[in-house]
Each structure stands twice: as structure tokens, then as C-alpha cells.
From Swiss-Prot:
Signal peptide: none annotated. Residues 1-27 are annotated as: Disordered. The keyword Metal-binding does not apply. It catalyses: [pyruvate, water dikinase] + ADP = [pyruvate, water dikinase]-phosphate + AMP + H(+); [pyruvate, water dikinase]-phosphate + phosphate + H(+) = [pyruvate, water dikinase] + diphosphate. This is Putative phosphoenolpyruvate synthase regulatory protein. Keywords: Kinase, Nucleotide-binding, Serine/threonine-protein kinase, Transferase. Belongs to the pyruvate, phosphate/water dikinase regulatory protein family. PSRP subfamily. Bifunctional serine/threonine kinase and phosphorylase involved in the regulation of the phosphoenolpyruvate synthase (PEPS) by catalyzing its phosphorylation/dephosphorylation.
Length: 301
């Protein structure tokens, strides 16, 4: 029986010693890995899931989105692109898939890739546990254009756009939440995310130097304090963001940013308004915190 061969430059193991497995050589694997997101619908579900999983790894990923793969023919085209990536990069791409069509799914499995099938992972065990066959309907989660929840969501988006940055005081009583904070603290993206993702009517209102001089909330908000939630931000981060918009201005100066942030936080404390710093939080984290703090009568999500 032949002895195991040591890599170049390594000393062979002493006679009688247990051979140790060879360690991977640095550089064997690419710094960036290609990820395909294959879905028979919009791909939002698969993309969200893949983002959560891949965020656990300190590595760069090149994402290729392939929505509306709802026939075997389209699956074959997808396989061609996946295999092309395999031959180019020398490593199997990672594929997240939510295909319902069994023939399309079968075709996709011929790809030279690591395939993570969300339906096979979750739906099949649930079918066994519930003793019930799933509908296997394509895009069922998103086929809601005629539902009440969908209409509420569109209405919420229109409301949030109309009430962005204090543009309108009309119908504020309809708001589920009113976000306040200094300019560029993250109010607009958070409002739109709450509207689009959860169907919440989210208005937002800027706190400006005039408010700080008066030491009071804007008059239009007096009657809606229970609906108000505040956003703050680190002054240094704020000056960086504002300089991208208006470089070298007083508006973006660090001294002014410190003043506005300090005054806004002091006002929110005086008024008993719950608030958080958006500095190191994603829009999703901010929205989740707001949902935990406010009481919403409707359930659109």
C-alpha cells in the first residue's frame, strides 16, 4: 500500500503516524461567490431569505436575479446561465429557489450548483406535519391585487407620499404613525417602508430650528402626540449625509448638526416621545422597533 504524498515543501509524516487531512490552500476559493435567485414569481421571497442567510458570512456575493421562471423551458435557460458561471469561475454557484412547477424544478436540479430549495425545505415537512397538501400555486403570496389588504397598502403609500416632510397637515388623524426628527435622519425611507411593507399610513415631519427656538413641537402635531415616534442620528453621521446634498453649507456644518440633534432629542424627552437613533440601524430594524412601540388597529401584514 503506497504512502500518502505530502504537499510540496511539507515533511512526510513519521512512520506509523496517523495521516492528517490536508488543509485547503489559501486562495483555493474565490473572494466573490455567484448566487442565483430563481423564482417563478417576483423573487422577493427568495431574495429576502437569501439576504438573511448570506449576511451571516463575511464574504462578497454577486447576486443574479432570475424572476418569472415558471416553465421548464425557462428553467433550462436558467440552467445554461448557472452552468456558464460554474465553468467560468470553477466553483458551483449557490442557487436559492422557490419554484413551484415540478417540471421546472426538476430541470433546475440539473444545474452544476448548490441548490437551496425553500419549498422542499419548508413546505414538504409542513405537508407531512399538517396532513395537508399545499396548493403549489405559483406566486400565490403576491396574487393579491384585488384584496382589501392590497388596496390598503396602495392607500398607505399614497398617504405617506402626500405627508412626506410635513408637506400636508390634512387627515393626520388617519395616520398610524407620525415620524419626527431633524432633516436627513431617515424619516422618509422609514415612512415609505412602513407603508409598502406593512400597509401603515406613516407621515413624517421635520423638526427645524424654528421649533427649537419655540421649544415646542410643530403646532400641527399637538393633537396627535400618541402617534408620534422620533428618529435621531449621530451628528457626525448627519454632517456626512448633509454634505452629500449641500456641501460646505451651514446646514451641513458639524456645529449646526450637533445643535439640531441635541435640541431635537431634548424636545422629544420633554414631550415624552419615544425615539431611537437611526445611526447604526437598517430601515428594517427601525421599522420593526416602531411596530413594537406603536399600537396599530389594522393588521395588513
Amino acid at each position: 500500500m503506497s504512502e500518502p504524498v505530502a504537499p510540496d515543501g511539507a515533511q512526510p509524516a513519521p512512520a506509523g503516524a496517523t495521516p492528517q487531512p490536508l488543509q485547503p490552500i489559501a486562495g483555493d476559493r474565490p473572494a466573490t461567490r455567484t448566487v442565483f435567485i430563481v423564482s417563478d414569481g417576483t423573487g422577493i421571497t427568495a431574495e429576502t431569505f437569501s439576504h438573511s442567510i448570506l449576511a451571516q458570512f463575511e464574504m462578497r456575493f454577486r447576486k443574479v436575479r432570475m424572476p418569472f421562471v415558471d416553465t421548464p423551458e425557462k428553467a433550462h435557460i436558467a440552467v445554461g446561465k448557472i452552468n456558464e458561471a460554474f465553468h467560468t469561475e470553477g466553483v458551483p454557484p449557490i442557487v436559492f429557489t422557490t419554484l413551484v412547477n415540478q417540471e421546472a424544478n426538476k430541470a433546475l436540479r440539473r444545474a452544476k450548483a448548490m441548490i437551496l430549495d425553500m419549498f422542499q425545505t419548508f413546505i414538504e415537512p409542513l405537508e407531512k406535519e399538517l396532513g395537508l397538501k399545499s396548493t403549489h400555486a405559483i406566486g400565490r403570496f403576491h396574487q393579491n391585487a384585488d384584496t382589501e389588504a392590497y388596496k390598503n397598502r396602495i392607500e398607505a403609500i399614497n398617504f405617506s407620499l402626500a405627508h412626506d416632510d410635513g408637506q400636508s397637515h390634512k387627515n393626520l388623524q388617519e395616520a398610524d404613525v407620525i415620524l419626527v426628527g431633524v432633516s436627513r435622519s431617515g424619516k422618509t425611507p422609514t415612512s415609505l417602508y412602513l407603508a409598502m411593507q406593512y400597509g401603515l399610513k406613516a407621515a413624517n415631519y421635520p423638526l427645524i430650528p424654528d421649533d427649537f427656538e419655540r421649544g415646542k413641537l410643530p403646532k400641527a402635531l399637538y393633537d396627535y402626540k400618541p402617534k408620534i415616534f422620533g428618529l435621531s442620528i449621530d451628528p457626525q453621521r448627519l454632517t456626512e449625509i448633509r454634505n452629500e446634498r449641500r456641501p460646505g453649507s451651514k446646514y451641513a456644518a458639524i456645529e449646526n448638526c450637533r445643535y439640531e440633534v441635541n435640541e431635537a432629542e431634548a424636545m422629544m424627552r420633554r414631550e415624552g416621545i419615544k425615539w431611537l437613533s437611526s445611526t447604526h440601524k437598517s430601515i428594517e430594524e427601525i421599522a420593526t422597533t416602531i411596530l413594537q412601540e406603536i399600537k396599530v388597529d389594522r393588521d395588513n401584514y
